[in-house]
Curated annotation (Swiss-Prot):
GO biological process: defense response
Domain-level remarks: The presence of a 'disulfide through disulfide knot' structurally defines this protein as a knottin.
Cysteines engaged in disulfide bonds, as pairs: C4-C20, C8-C22, C13-C27
Family named by the database record: Belongs to the cyclotide family. Bracelet subfamily.
Name of the protein: Cycloviolin-C
Naturally occurring in which organism (per UniProt): Leonia cymosa (Sacha uba)
Protein backbone atom coordinates (compact mmCIF):
# COMPACT_ATOMS: atom_id res chain seq x y z
CA UNK A 1 0.00 0.00 0.00
CA UNK A 2 3.01 2.42 0.00
CA UNK A 3 3.58 4.18 -3.34
CA UNK A 4 7.01 3.48 -4.77
CA UNK A 5 7.01 6.59 -6.93
CA UNK A 6 6.84 4.66 -10.16
CA UNK A 7 4.07 4.16 -12.70
CA UNK A 8 3.44 0.98 -14.66
CA UNK A 9 1.20 2.24 -17.44
CA UNK A 10 3.57 1.51 -20.32
CA UNK A 11 6.34 -0.55 -18.71
CA UNK A 12 6.45 -2.94 -15.72
CA UNK A 13 7.63 -1.80 -12.31
CA UNK A 14 11.41 -1.80 -12.06
CA UNK A 15 10.92 -1.56 -8.31
CA UNK A 16 9.66 -5.14 -8.16
CA UNK A 17 13.19 -5.98 -7.01
CA UNK A 18 12.43 -3.82 -3.96
CA UNK A 19 9.15 -5.62 -3.27
CA UNK A 20 6.84 -3.34 -5.24
CA UNK A 21 3.98 -4.48 -7.45
CA UNK A 22 1.71 -2.87 -10.03
CA UNK A 23 -1.72 -1.77 -8.80
CA UNK A 24 -3.98 0.67 -10.66
CA UNK A 25 -1.16 1.75 -13.00
CA UNK A 26 1.06 2.69 -10.03
CA UNK A 27 3.75 0.68 -8.26
CA UNK A 28 2.99 -0.02 -4.60
CA UNK A 29 4.70 -1.86 -1.79
CA UNK A 30 2.22 -3.25 0.85
Amino acid sequence: GIPCGESCVFIPCLTTVAGCSCKNKVCYRN
